[in-house]
Amino acid sequence: MAERVQSHTPGPNKLPARYLQFQKRYPKVFQAYDALGAATAEAGPLTDKTRALVKLAIAMGGEMEGAVHSHTRRALEAGCSPEEIYHVALLGTTTLGFPTTMKIFSWMDDVLAQKE
């Protein structure tokens, strides 16, 4: 069984300003969103690391830069290594295409370079 999820949202010092503004402006919506994230995480057998990598892959497929940044940070927090994170991007090459994969690597580097 998967580990129990404490919160869907990372610490406040890691959140983008836009996210914090949304949280402040729409607290009830934010609470519902946070609860939905926790409920979906707890609904199945995936581990924290596996969930983090799956969510990263979903963000990659949507070509969402902010989400790739966020889920790269979350993958690190879940205990994933940079090599595991880069492997997810590499696996997307044949599905997303080489130019998209290069773009995703640059987004991951935005986060991973700060950790070095």
Tell me what each language-model feature is.
Residues Y33, G37, L53-M60, V88-T93:
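Short alpha-helical scaffolding segments that buttress acidic/His motifs in well-ordered protein cores
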Residues Q23, T40, G44, G61-E65, ...:
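Residues at alpha-helix boundaries and short interhelical turns
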Residues Y86-D109:
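C-terminal structural segments of small proteins and small subunits
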Residues M1-T50, K103-E116:
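Acidic, glycine/proline-rich low-complexity segments that act as flexible tails and inter-domain linkers
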Residues K49-L53, S70:
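Short connector loops at helix/strand junctions that flank enzyme active sites
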Residues M60-A89:
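Mid-chain, well-packed structural core segment of small domains
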Residues E42, L76, T94:
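Short polybasic/polar patches that bind polyanions
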